[in-house]
Amino acid sequence: MADYKSTLNLPYTQFPMRGNLPIIEIKILERWNRDNLYEIIRRKKNEKKLFLLHDGPPYANGFIHLGHAVNKILKDIIIKFKGLSGYDAPYIPGWDCHGLPIELQVEKLIKKVNMDIDINSQEFRNYCREYVKKQIEIQKKDFIRLGILGEWKNPYLTMDYKTEANIIRTLGKIISNGYFYKGIKPVYWCFQCHSALANSEVEYNDYHYSNAVDVGFSIVENVSINKIFNINCYIENIELVIWTTTIWTLPANQAISIHPDYIYQLVKILDNEKYLIIAANLVNMFMNRIKCTMWQVLGEVLGSKLDRLTARHPFMNFNVPLVLSKHIKLDSGTGLVHIAPDHGPDDYLISKKYKFKNRDSLIDSNGYYLSNSHNRLCGLHIFNANEIIIDLLYKSKNFLYFNANYQHSYPYCWRHKIPLIFRTTSQWFVNMDHNNLRDKLLRTLQQVRWIPDSGYSSMQSMIVNRPDWCLSRQRVWGIPIPVFVHKKTEVLHPNTCIFIEQVAQLVEKYGIQIWWDLKNEDIILNKAESMNYQKIYDTLDVWFDSGSTHDSVILDRFNSKLKSKLQIDLYLEGVDQYRGWFMSSLIIAVAIKGYAPYKQVLSHGFTIDDKGNKMSKSLGNIIRPLDIVNKFGSDILRLWVASSDYSKDMVISDDVLKNVTDIYRRIRNTIRFFLANINDFDPEKDLVQSNRMVALDQWAINHTLSVQVKIISNYEQYKFHNVIRYIMKFCSIEMGSFYLDVVKDRLYTLNKDSLARRSCQTALYHIIESMVRWIAPILSFTADEIWKYIPGNRSKYVFTEEWYDRLFKIDENQIVNSNYWNFFLNIRNKVNKVIEQERVNGIIKGSLEADVILYVTPILKKKLRILKNELAFGLIVSSVMVLSIDDVDFNTIKENHEENSDELKVVLKKSHGIKCLRCWNYTLSMSKNENYLNICSRCVHNITGLGEDRRFF
């Protein structure tokens, strides 16, 4: 039997079926690095419109985690698609270099090397700087392995001398505009940080347990209280009941606050003759708490009537006043709040309103009670004091009414995961209400595009409720707050802004250590004057470091390409950065420039496992990005990021990665089919003009164009999961289940140089030129690999290109236009249902074994006959007859048929033809030529002559 394989145009390509990504990606990275790909792109795009995505700097500490990978990959996708869209989109990665976490790691390393080493602050800063350098190199290597293109040779570091100097200059602008002040306020305090924290460094633990207690304070003016409640008989020992979850603050109590507009009741507990004052709305809740069933209401008054009365502290030897405050709520407690000005912002404001005398703090910076607290508490840590305080309450005439564990949300240190306290200390702040800053921030929010929209409301609520920003930290490794204050008045030196610039110039040359080395007279040249001032040694909140980079880094790097009003196009970070980098950047920008630093803010969710748990060491569910890369390749990780809806938490697991691998395989195999079938195609010689192309090929290019429009639109909207969805649908349905199936006969069996075959190759060429660009931002390594297999002259890298612009629309004036193709595809789907049913029934094994009769209305018959004898190729069957639906009685038809509709009925029967060994069609028109036995006449014509002519399929 003759072998006709050599007469076929069988697909061939050296593009591998298997990606082998973990190995091939390393080689590609070596080439990118050798060629300096990032610089090639910059030179090519230099004259284009600038698009700036500013990198929120990750902390230079530890290996990268999955959250880092998600963030960097999303940024890289955007940078690359913006390049394809005709922008100059540079990417300057950055690192946050100062702060406590670095200090802690360096301390551990020093102790590990030499337990007895004693180093000074300067040496410690040097250790920190060297540690950060090493950490950056580790993280940089991992980010590059993910396929992230950027200015890795010159990233921005908040510890670069010039950046440190510029951050100090930004602080100078804050000071110059009047927002900077020193205040004694309660601030979040971490005992392990030994420092104040800003709101952005606080996270809330919803599963924190505290001792909740109801405590009685005896009224001193019993006569007055009897009159206020209009009690006829004289009552003694009336108590005000407060409820608190911070027992340790009771020794610091200085007042009890009540709401002026709430009703308060004097109630008598009948079984023990106790007289208590509680908010009327909370009496029942209180009685349930103490399991009291019998009480009597003796009277009620507005809270305002109780103002300025006094009560006796239950175990400290002093009286405290009743004061009015509208911050009290009626959702829990008793409607009376104990006021400890040292340990709460609202308490502090009340103390200022009522001009309380300043008292020395009762606790030190480590959380231990001082001698001025209580003799039983001195030297005890506040978190270990509950039992003693409860005992003091029991022994003080039974002033404790209720004591129980209470679960509630409580502030924790973002780094140490331990409870925080409010502690009144002297700190430096940004005044949120100076020059209407808070109102300006709220107005500015409306001018920013928030993605998702919920970002706007998140920022709005935080700004409304935000206290003044505490800028100062009591740390060693940080950018100094380089100011001088008068030793007596603590007022800033009048030349502070001049000094700031002088210090910045020195820091730019010598680094931050210079501030600690300087003497007063080095800056304040008048020696006598310098004696009256002291240098401040506090360091800046690290959120000021990173939050000022729009001014200290971007303005410096892109000044030549920027207009007078600098607004960065996009900030992109995790949802936790609304209270962090997004917020600090906004406050600084509005304070110094009057407008937002960014035009758009995009946030992404966290990574979670398939059970909905966040990644954590304790759960043992952490997946390192480099483990995924080493097993599957970076493109699989990138595809997972792109295919996930990052606006929510992103699920990752072995099953999820398996599904992503299947998606990748489908895309790769589709492109491999394209490459394999244009291996003998030279676009310089073989490209067919659109008006000469086969109709189906025109449809394919038209459809590719419509898909490309959707893909680009979804890239622009940052909806990358939709991009993947469109690509997958294109590969699996429009191409895989239709176009590529139909054109196989034409590609394989027609004359190699026939117009019909070259037409199809032209379509495949245009489509792959489009597809390689579609996937390049996401599957960067694979796109780079594909690029070198596409025929024709081209630039070295797809990343220097723009979206493919040689696709075209169908001429809608021609008969076989878009509407006609929709009509045909509807017919084809109905025929395929019948074919599949008969295959399941065992009548046929494949569609080419089928002869199909279409019974249709005259209108449909006329439309189908446009395709003439090519209809069978479009349906991938051996033969098709189109008959009138009115000319047949279906009861007389023995073959199975599908009652599709009143317009169309499909009848299928197994072909009685002979199978052609070359094209596999079944036909009665077999060759009688002795040189070409067992093949059909059509195949002989295609082998020996010019071949058949195709207009439609």
UniProtKB/Swiss-Prot annotation:
Matching Pfam families: Anticodon_1 (PF08264), tRNA-synt_1 (PF00133), zf-FPG_IleRS (PF06827)
Residues annotated as transmembrane: none
Molecular-function GO terms, alphabetical: aminoacyl-tRNA deacylase activity; ATP binding; isoleucine-tRNA ligase activity; tRNA binding; zinc ion binding
Catalytic activity: tRNA(Ile) + L-isoleucine + ATP = L-isoleucyl-tRNA(Ile) + AMP + diphosphate
UniProt motif 'KMSKS' region: location: 614-618
Binding of ATP, residues: 617
Enzyme Commission (EC) number: 6.1.1.5
Keywords from the UniProt entry: Aminoacyl-tRNA synthetase, ATP-binding, Cytoplasm, Ligase, Metal-binding, Nucleotide-binding, Protein biosynthesis, Zinc
PROSITE patterns per the UniProt record, alphabetical: AA_TRNA_LIGASE_I (PS00178)
SUPFAM superfamilies: Anticodon-binding domain of a subclass of class I aminoacyl-tRNA synthetases, Nucleotidylyl transferase, ValRS/IleRS/LeuRS editing domain
Subcellular compartments: Cytoplasm
Entry's Gene Ontology cellular component terms: cytosol
Intrachain disulfide bonds: none
Annotated motif 'HIGH' region, positions: 58-68
Cofactor(s) named in the record: Zn(2+)
Cofactor comment text: Binds 1 zinc ion per subunit.
Binding positions (L-isoleucyl-5'-AMP): 573
GO biological process: isoleucyl-tRNA aminoacylation
Residues reported in the UniProt entry to bind Zn(2+): 916, 919, 936, 939
Family statement drawn from the similarity comment of this UniProt entry: Belongs to the class-I aminoacyl-tRNA synthetase family. IleS type 1 subfamily.
Record note on quaternary structure: Monomer.
Role summary: Catalyzes the attachment of isoleucine to tRNA(Ile). As IleRS can inadvertently accommodate and process structurally similar amino acids such as valine, to avoid such errors it has two additional distinct tRNA(Ile)-dependent editing activities. One activity is designated as 'pretransfer' editing and involves the hydrolysis of activated Val-AMP. The other activity is designated 'posttransfer' editing and involves deacylation of mischarged Val-tRNA(Ile).
Entry remark concerning the domains of this protein: IleRS has two distinct active sites: one for aminoacylation and one for editing. The misactivated valine is translocated from the active site to the editing site, which sterically excludes the correctly activated isoleucine. The single editing site contains two valyl binding pockets, one specific for each substrate (Val-AMP or Val-tRNA(Ile)).
Identification of the protein by name: Isoleucine--tRNA ligase
